[in-house]
Amino acid sequence: MNLEQYTKINNFFIRHSTAFSLLLTANRLLTACGFLLYPLLLLCLLTKKNIAMLICFIAIPALCFLAVTIFRKVVNKKRPYEKLPIQSLIKKDKKGQSFPSRHVFSIFLIATLWFCFWKPVGIFLFIAGVFLAIVRVIGGVHFVTDVCAGALLGVLAGLISNYVFLIC
C-alpha cells in the first residue's frame, strides 16, 4: 500500500471509533485464536498417543519459527510506519524486522497442522489467518508482501512438518 491508501484508511478509523476498536479487538482475538489452538492440537495428539506426529508438530515448527526470526533480523525490513509518514493503528514500537510477518506465519503454520489433523479446524484457521493478514496491513504494522510471505512460509512449514511425520 502507498501513503495515500494508508492515509485514507487511517482517517476512516480515526473518524469511526467503533471500527477502530473492532480492528484492535480483531488483531488480539485472531492472534489469540491461533496461539490457543496450537496447544490444543498438541494435547489432542498426546491423548491419541500419536507421539510421532506430536514430535514432528513440535520440533519442525519450532525450528521454522526460529529460522523465520533469524531471517527477519538479517533482512531487517522497515515497517510501514517507518517508511511512510504514517501513524500505525496497531501500536508497535519495534523497528524493522517486518518481513515476513511472524503473526501471519504462525497462524498459517498452525492452520496447516490442524488441516493435516482435522480439516474443519484447519479451514477455520486459514480463514482467520486471511483476516489477521488484512488486519496487520490495515493496522500499518506490515506491508502486503510481509503477510503474503508469512502465509506462504507458514503453509510450507506446516506441510514439511506433516511430510516428515509421514516418512518417519
Show which residues each predicted segment covers.
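N-terminal transmembrane-helix/juxtamembrane module of multi-pass inner/ER membrane proteins
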Residues: 1-37, 52, 68-96
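Membrane-helix interface segments
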Residues: 18-19, 49-53, 80-81, 118-123, ...
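Transmembrane-embedded, aromatic-rich helix segments that form part
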Residues: 36-39, 125
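Interfacial segments of alpha-helical transmembrane regions
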Residues: 39-67, 147
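Transmembrane helix-loop junctions and nearby membrane-interface residues
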Residues: 42-49, 73, 121, 137, ...
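Small-polar-interrupted transmembrane alpha-helices in polytopic inner-membrane proteins
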Residues: 59-72, 123-135
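Transmembrane alpha-helical segments of multi-pass membrane transport proteins and ion-pumping complexes
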Residues: 65-69, 73, 155-162
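Membrane-embedded catalytic cores of phosphoryl/pyrophosphoryl-handling enzymes
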Residues: 85-168
